[in-house]
Amino acid sequence: SPHYNFGL
């Protein structure tokens, strides 16, 4: 699954 980095 794709990984979305929201600055976490």
Curated annotation (Swiss-Prot):
Keyword Secreted: yes
Subcellular compartments: Secreted
GO biological process: neuropeptide signaling pathway
Domain of life: Eukaryota
Cysteine disulfide links: none
Chief location bin: secreted
Keywords attached to this entry: Amidation, Neuropeptide, Secreted
GO cellular component: extracellular region
Leucine amide modification, residue list: L8
Entry similarity comment: Belongs to the allatostatin family.
Protein name according to UniProt: Cydiastatin-1
Annotated organism of origin: Cydia pomonella (Codling moth)
